[in-house]
Amino acid sequence: MEFYASLKSIAMHAPSECIKNVAFQEFLDTSDEWIEKRTGIKERRFASVGEKSSDLGVIAAKQAIERAHLTPQDIDLVVVATLSPDFLAMPSTACVLSAKLGIENKPAFDISAACTGFIYLLSVAKAYVESGMYENVLIVGAEKTSSVLDFKDRGTCILFGDGAGACVIGRTKHLKESILDVQISANGNFSNYLYTPRTLKPTPFNAKEETSDPFLCMKGNEVFKLAVKTLLKDVEMILEKNALKPEDVRLFIPHQANLRIIQAVREHLDFKDEQVVLTVHKYGNTSAASIPMAMGEAYEEGRLKKGDLMLLDAFGGGLTWGSALVYFGGS
């Protein structure tokens, strides 16, 4: 291989409106202590009424492109992961975001892998770059999860937040600046564990019209148990496959769904506190945006530097899951 795919830049964006746990006490049977004890979440950000996922994503994308020392016209492909797209069926959020960036006549499409979306993005971008088809791929995890939440459901609405993270994937000749490995999986037999109901109208030929709210539904206990079991196995697998140990990893950046899930994986693999990046307490679960937002924050805080090896993992609706070993190829 003449070159490898490389994560050249990372940027994140969080909306300005900060919603603390106490805000939910006004309309739900809950408390700040109850939420934090069970999830580790203290606050989250919500986008404004007029903002969409693409609006959040374009802010992160512009900064990622700038940090890669490129212009929007240098981008060959745009891929967005989201469970809260701007439009229900079409156009894709990637197309909308491309237009807002001023990118024309370049391919753009969405990926639907829920909270595992960013790992899927890495897999797709790595394949396209290393095949030689595209040189610079913009990947964006952008979510306005607040648009799909039922604020009468204590089990879901307290968990999620809005935000976006973006990366430019380019080329490198150096293995230790590359996306070393990505593994993704899914099992649709558990699709009813985490989903949003069908919202498209039935055909006029249906004898009985069925409608449902477009709100996120989750079997919390079942998802928690499967997530811990699956992620432990998946992370062990990717480390063993690449002959690496936890101590070889500079930063462990998991999907920020629930502090208890993160701690279970961290303790099992004996990661030190300084290796683990945590943002769940301040942003909640931002689905496909959570990993790039955590990466972006680590970069901005000076914790992530060129050549650092990151271990990423995620689990989400589908059910989907995946992990990645990524050297930071930026500066």
From Swiss-Prot:
EC code: 2.3.1.180
SUPFAM superfamilies: Thiolase-like
Main location: cytoplasm
Region (ACP-binding): 256-260
UniProt keyword list: Acyltransferase, Cytoplasm, Fatty acid biosynthesis, Fatty acid metabolism, Lipid biosynthesis, Lipid metabolism, Multifunctional enzyme, Transferase
PANTHER family to which the protein is assigned, alphabetical: 3-OXOACYL-[ACYL-CARRIER-PROTEIN] SYNTHASE 3 (PTHR34069), BETA-KETOACYL-[ACYL-CARRIER-PROTEIN] SYNTHASE III (PTHR34069:SF2)
Pathway membership, UniProt: Lipid metabolism; fatty acid biosynthesis
Positions of the catalytic residues: 115, 255, 285
The protein's enzyme class: transferase
Protein's name according to its UniProt entry: Beta-ketoacyl-[acyl-carrier-protein] synthase III
Pfam families: ACP_syn_III, ACP_syn_III_C
Cell compartments where the protein resides: Cytoplasm
GO molecular function per UniProt: 3-oxoacyl-[acyl-carrier-protein] synthase activity; beta-ketoacyl-acyl-carrier-protein synthase III activity
Reported function: Catalyzes the condensation reaction of fatty acid synthesis by the addition to an acyl acceptor of two carbons from malonyl-ACP. Catalyzes the first condensation reaction which initiates fatty acid synthesis and may therefore play a role in governing the total rate of fatty acid production. Possesses both acetoacetyl-ACP synthase and acetyl transacylase activities. Its substrate specificity determines the biosynthesis of branched-chain and/or straight-chain of fatty acids.
Oligomer and partners: Homodimer.
GO biological process: fatty acid biosynthetic process; secondary metabolite biosynthetic process
Signal peptide extent: none
Protein encoded by which gene: fabH
Protein family per UniProt: Belongs to the thiolase-like superfamily. FabH family.
HAMAP family assigned to the protein according to its UniProt record, in alphabetical order: FabH
InterPro entries: ACP_syn_III_C, ACP_syn_III_N, FabH, Thiolase-like
Catalytic activity field: malonyl-[ACP] + acetyl-CoA + H(+) = 3-oxobutanoyl-[ACP] + CO2 + CoA
Gene3D superfamilies, alphabetized: 3.40.47.10
Annotated domain remarks: The last Arg residue of the ACP-binding site is essential for the weak association between ACP/AcpP and FabH.
Listed GO CC annotations: cytoplasm
